């Protein structure tokens, strides 16, 4: 945890009182004392610092801080991801990783090679996935929570929803081991938002690939090696970010 994240509702008259895992981290990991300063931010809001004003003694685990939010949140990420629903244990890892690396929206959809039981994992009950996104933000010192949208049927997603949003993207990429293009060729030279589609463990089936390419998605391969979904998401995000940064600097 590199930043303590709070909600607007937790701040009262410039003060916040913590009595959960965040307080435990301040006490046990940071070993902070009264008067020490820690990074703090409001989810989907400003960042700044918190000065510790009180640390509970005895059986009290409470930590109180005076909050000074003097920094604007980082700009919104310009990468969104379409993800065929993976196994729950892998989805948890991916949620944390994409929040840490920075995405705007995660579109989670069904696919031919996705087991229907994956939707019953409980992660989507009462937004149970939020804690995993939060862990990624805490790692990256960010406050902007990615949006998550779920689609339990593939065809309504790709035929009805997706055509309504594609105009908002400068580049659209579908990761496919037999794609004919390289990642660098799929990214347009002009800056803008990018939409990346990553399939399930068994990959997208031909019908799904055709649906994406009919919407002007560029099918790209990331090399000869077949990667697990969580590895592919991180590698592709990093590759896109590196290519765009190199172009931005004119190298």
Residue spans for each PLM region:
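Hydrophobic side chains in well-ordered alpha-helices
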Residues: 26, 91-94, 208
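Structured adenosyl-cofactor binding patch, chiefly the S-adenosyl-L-methionine
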Residues: 206-251
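Active-site/ligand-binding-proximal alpha/beta "capping" segment
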Residues: 164, 169-208, 217-220
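RNA substrate-binding interface of SAM-dependent RNA methyltransferases
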Residues: 72-173
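N-terminal positively charged helical leader segments and presequences
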Residues: 1-71
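Structural motif
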Residues: 2-3, 37, 62-63, 79-81, ...
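Short secondary-structure boundary segments
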Residues: 42, 110-111, 176-179, 200, ...
């Amino acid at each position: 945890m590199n930043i303590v994240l709070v909600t607007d509702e937790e701040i009262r008259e410039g003060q916040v009182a913590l009595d959960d895992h965040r307080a435990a981290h301040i006490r046990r990991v940071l070993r902070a004392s009264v008067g020490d300063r820690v990074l703090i931010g409001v989810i989907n809001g400003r960042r700044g610092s918190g000065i510790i004003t009180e640390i509970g003694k005895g059986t009290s685990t409470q930590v109180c801080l005076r909050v000074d939010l003097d920094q604007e949140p980082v700009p919104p990420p310009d990468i969104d991801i379409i993800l065929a629903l993976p196994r729950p244990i892998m989805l948890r890892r991916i949620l944390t990783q994409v929040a840490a690396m920075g995405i705007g929206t995660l579109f989670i959809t069904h696919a031919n090679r996705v087991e229907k039981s994956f939707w019953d994992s409980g992660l989507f009950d009462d937004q149970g996935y939020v804690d995993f996104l939060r862990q990624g933000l805490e790692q990256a010192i960010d406050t902007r929570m990615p949006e998550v949208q779920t689609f339990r049927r593939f065809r309504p997603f790709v035929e009805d929803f997706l055509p309504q949003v594609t105009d908002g993207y400068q580049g659209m990429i579908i990761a496919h081991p037999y794609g004919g293009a390289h990642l660098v060729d799929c990214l347009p030279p002009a800056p803008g938002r990018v939409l990346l589609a990553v399939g399930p463990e068994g990959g997208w089936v031909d019908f799904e690939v055709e649906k994406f390419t009919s919407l002007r998605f560029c099918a790209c391969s990331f090399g000869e090696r077949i990667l697990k979904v969580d590895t592919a998401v991180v590698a592709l995000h990093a590759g896109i970010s590196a290519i765009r940064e190199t172009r931005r600097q004119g190298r």
